[in-house]
């Protein structure tokens, strides 16, 4: 059984920015390439994000948000319903003085976007309430490199940076999107990661952290899928799945409206259960007829002597990612959305690279 200490809480932000160049796609997403020496997902292209630090939930943030925004929600609106915990997944008793989880996780994602990409998702403390349109990253001020080094060394310095700039983290620009838990067996490190979506009017300047990040690209969801299939980039199954979701939106404004208008529901948080077939691997997701929400499968995989094709043909109620090889995934989905979310768009590349809806 996984103890609470073996799961590291994390947050990631999918940055979707407007694209002014001539192109049929209306927005691009920031993907960072992780260095090969990283223990988790070496070489992968990922969204900015990282592990939650105690500094992200510090009550010291309250003074920075004051007087315009007051605890506990700081103007975020009603607290979203809580998802029942997975068996064996508990984060223990929270400090009663700490910020609410969804505030702290937003600060974490914003801090990591600065550390990894040099993007400042901040807004002036005296700014008017957020307008009903995509946000804008803060222009990098002088001396930012030194601050970035300090924040990387000590996350508590992010609060000091915000105070120095007389800004607050733009937590209102981050919309709930979903969450993923690392499946058993992929790595000794397992993460409970909350995904946020942030729409930006313009593409901000990016300066990758050369220690953890060796490159970056702004790609539309369809471009990212094509680059993955052509082996130009590698995406882990959660990132691939989210890219396919985002193909539902033709423009930044459509994506922003969806995020803004989506009612507060129990946020998705999915723990893939791995089914090992005789010739491949299937990541079973909640709702799939073979998915077993049982504590036994937190620490082991399922297996069968059947081939992948047999398993797929037998299924009727599906929510799964079939892994044929590192660069050939298939998404099978027959479920209606239970929480007003979108599911991966039907997008045919070739016979072996099809999202089945």
UniProtKB/Swiss-Prot annotation:
Chain segments annotated as coiled-coil in the UniProt record: none
Give details on activation and inhibition.
Inhibited by chenodeoxycholic acid (CDCA) and its conjugated derivatives, taurochenodeoxycholic acid and glycochenodeoxycholic acid. Inhibited by fluoride.
Where mainly found? other
Q: Which GO terms describe its cellular component?
A: mitochondrion; peroxisome
Motif Microbody targeting signal positions after renumbering to this chain: 355-357
Q: Where is this motif: Nudix box?
A: 97-118
Q: What induces it?
A: By testosterone.
Report the record's Gene Ontology biological process terms. Answer: butyryl-CoA catabolic process; coenzyme A catabolic process; malonyl-CoA catabolic process; medium-chain fatty-acyl-CoA catabolic process; propionyl-CoA metabolic process; succinyl-CoA catabolic process
Entries under CDD domains matching the protein: NUDIX_AcylCoAdiphos_Nudt19 (cd18870)
Q: Tissue range of expression? A: Highly expressed in the kidneys, with lower levels in skeletal muscle and brain (at protein level).
Residues noted as binding Mg(2+) in the record, renumbered to the chain:
112, 116
Q: How does activity depend on pH?
A: Optimum pH is 9.0.
Query: What is the documented function of this protein?
Result: Fatty acyl-coenzyme A (CoA) diphosphatase that hydrolyzes fatty acyl-CoA to yield acyl-4'-phosphopantetheine and adenosine 3',5'-bisphosphate. Mediates the hydrolysis of a wide range of CoA esters, including choloyl-CoA and branched-chain fatty-acyl-CoA esters and at low substrate concentrations medium and long-chain fatty-acyl-CoA esters are the primary substrates. Highest activity seen with medium-chain acyl-CoA esters and higher rates of activity seen with the unsaturated acyl-CoA esters compared with the saturated esters. Exhibits decapping activity towards dpCoA-capped RNAs in vitro.
What protein does this entry describe?
Acyl-coenzyme A diphosphatase NUDT19
Q: Which organism is it from?
A: Mus musculus
């Amino acid at each position: 059984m996984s103890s609470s200490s073996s799961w590291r809480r994390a947050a990631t932000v999918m940055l979707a920015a407007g694209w002014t160049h001539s192109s049929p796609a209306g927005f691009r997403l920031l993907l960072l390439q992780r260095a090969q020496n990283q223990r988790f997902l070496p070489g992968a292209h990922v969204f900015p994000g990282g592990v939650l630090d105690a500094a992200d939930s510090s009550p010291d943030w309250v003074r920075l948000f004051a007087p315009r925004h007051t605890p506990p929600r700081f103007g975020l609106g009603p607290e979203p319903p809580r998802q029942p915990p997975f068996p064996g997944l508990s984060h223990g008793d929270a400090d009663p003085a700490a910020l609410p989880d969804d505030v702290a996780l937003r600060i974490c994602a914003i801090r990591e976007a600065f550390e990894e990409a040099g993007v400042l998702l901040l807004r002036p403390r005296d700014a008017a309430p957020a307008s009903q349109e995509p946000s804008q990253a803060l222009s990098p001020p002088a001396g930012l490199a030194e601050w970035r080094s300090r924040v990387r060394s000590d996350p508590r310095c992010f609060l000091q940076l915000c105070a120095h700039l007389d800004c607050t983290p733009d937590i209102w620009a981050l919309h709930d999107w979903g969450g993923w838990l690392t499946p058993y067996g992929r790595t000794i490190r397992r993460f409970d990661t909350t995904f946020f979506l942030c729409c930006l009017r313009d593409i901000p300047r990016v300066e990758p952290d050369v220690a953890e990040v060796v490159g970056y690209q702004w790609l539309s969801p369809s471009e990212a899928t094509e680059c993955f299939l052509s082996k130009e980039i590698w995406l882990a199954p959660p990132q691939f799945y989210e890219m396919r979701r985002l193909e539902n939106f033709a423009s930044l404004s459509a994506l922003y409206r969806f995020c803004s208008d989506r009612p507060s529901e129990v946020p998705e948080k999915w723990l893939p259960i791995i089914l090992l077939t005789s010739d491949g691997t299937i990541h079973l997701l909640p709702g799939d007829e073979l998915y077993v929400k049982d504590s036994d499968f937190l620490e082991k995989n399922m297996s069968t002597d059947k081939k992948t094709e047999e398993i797929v043909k037998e299924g009727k109620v599906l929510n799964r990612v079939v892994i044929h090889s590192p660069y050939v995934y298939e998404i099978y989905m027959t479920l209606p959305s239970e929480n007003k979310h979108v599911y991966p768009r039907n997008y045919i590349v070739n016979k072996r690279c099809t999202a089945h809806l």
